[in-house]
């Protein structure tokens, strides 16, 4: 199941990169707004639950919680 999820996410990233490189960006304002909203998302503090390391401020997730760096 994990392998299938990784393959799916990789395919989505490749498709997005290919579309952007061809200049087929239809909603430029929406895309830039989305980019800035992603930049302002907050990370999960230590001792709080996580699933992946990128969620944690310290980038250290040992399930089920974030650890301080």
Curated annotation (Swiss-Prot):
InterPro entries per record: Conotoxin
Intrachain S-S bonds: 43-57, 50-61, 56-66
Keyword field contains Iron: no
Main localization category: secreted
Annotated GO MF terms: ion channel inhibitor activity; toxin activity
Tissue distribution: Expressed by the venom duct.
Subcellular location: Secreted
GO CC list: extracellular region
Residues of the signal peptide: 1-17
Pro-peptide region(s): 18-40
Keyword annotations from UniProtKB, A to Z: Disulfide bond, Knottin, Secreted, Signal, Toxin
Any Pfam family matching the protein: Conotoxin
UniProt note: domains: The presence of a 'disulfide through disulfide knot' structurally defines this protein as a knottin. The cysteine framework is VI/VII (C-C-CC-C-C).
Protein family per UniProt: Belongs to the conotoxin O1 superfamily.
Protein name stated in the entry: Conotoxin AbVIE
Organism expressing this protein natively: Conus abbreviatus
């Amino acid at each position: 199941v994990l392998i299938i999820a990784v393959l799916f996410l990789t395919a989505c990233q490749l498709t997005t990169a290919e579309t952007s490189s061809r200049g087929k960006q239809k909603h430029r304002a929406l895309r830039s707004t989305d980019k800035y909203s992603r930049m302002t998302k907050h990370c999960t503090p230590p001792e709080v639950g996580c699933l992946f390391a990128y969620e944690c401020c310290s980038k250290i997730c040992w399930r089920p919680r974030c650890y301080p760096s």
